Amino acid sequence: MVRLVLIIFFVYTIILSIGSINCIDNNNLVTNQAALFVFGDSLFDAGNNNYINTVSSFRSNIWPYGQTNFKFPTGRLSDGPEKAWLPSIPPNLQPNNGNNQFTYGVSFASAGAGALAESFLGMVINLGTQLNNFKDVEKSLRSELGDAETKRVFSRAVYLFHIGANDYFYPFSANSSTFKSNSKEKFVDFVIGNITFVIEEVYKMGGRKFGFLNVGPYECSPNSLIRDRTKIGSCFKPVAELIDMHNKKFPDVLRRLQRQLSGFRYALHDYHTSLSERINSPSKYGFKEGKKACCGSGPLRGINTCGNRIGPSQGYGLCENVTDYLFYDSSHLTEKAHRQIAELIWNGPPNVTRPYNLKALFELRLT
């Protein structure tokens, strides 16, 4: 099972940056704020899995998650902080979410989620269900704000996506009928097709500005590096092949959508390259460990036992200095790593985030 890096520092670093391009009233609230709506997996799960009936390995509302800044577990899969002065972007399923919060955005993401409904079925909120939840938010906003204001909110908002990696790991963790009955290329096409459908649906609802990360090098996460116990430290090649296909095909889809959909604009961050560079050359980016996790057990702490999530009998180790590490647990990054990646997504040059970066998307005013 793979569970991808979370949005904690991504979104809140991004929110901090947004502050420079918005006005603030006397109550310190943004009065001209473009919303951020977030879809995806554990890269962006702000705690939705706390509110569904799932297994502990898909949650992180346990110690030591949150130890560095929150001082308590929040359900977010990193030890990163929340430092923004703006209203925080809540998980969609958090009780008592008010419509006023939704005007700033909301995260629909779910740790372990995929674009395919069969990926970890019954344990996560898949991308199609996340879309349905977004449609429910639309209804609430239309009721509260009216059609015209809701249309304005949606047209100015940015829609951020990271999804797909769980679909590519799932066939190697469980029985996938879709994977078994199709070629690898066709399977990747199914994943991308489901993502494309959701993008087009959000566009029909008024969305125009989209941010994407391609699929990261999770074939080389600590968890993946120990999958073949005869080759500890080797990346998991079966998944690498699928991820490579995805990352080659997906940019073509986005270019096609930009040609076909009037006003469609996007930012695509090359997350695979950004994270690969840090895994392979950690010292260049200020890390001592690029392949061993801070929290977990077994070789490279690659067994996902952080916080005794699979039972106290297993136990786990915890590093002394988390800033030395790229990975916090077997699949998720540390705050320091999040900060670096977030800056590349927000304000990165065209060789890493293109054709727009996220800052440019927020500043963009479409007529």
Curated annotation (Swiss-Prot):
InterPro entries: GDSL, GLIP1-5/GLL25, Lipase_GDSL_AS, SGNH_hydro_sf, SGNH_plant_lipase-like. Its main location: secreted. GO terms for cellular component: extracellular region. One of its GO terms (molecular function) is lipase activity. Glycans are attached at residues 175, 194, 321, 351. Keywords: Glycoprotein, Hydrolase, Lipid degradation, Lipid metabolism, Secreted, Signal. The active site is at 42 (nucleophile), 329, 332. Gene3D superfamilies: SGNH hydrolase. This is GDSL esterase/lipase 3. It comes from Arabidopsis thaliana (Mouse-ear cress). The gene is GLIP3.
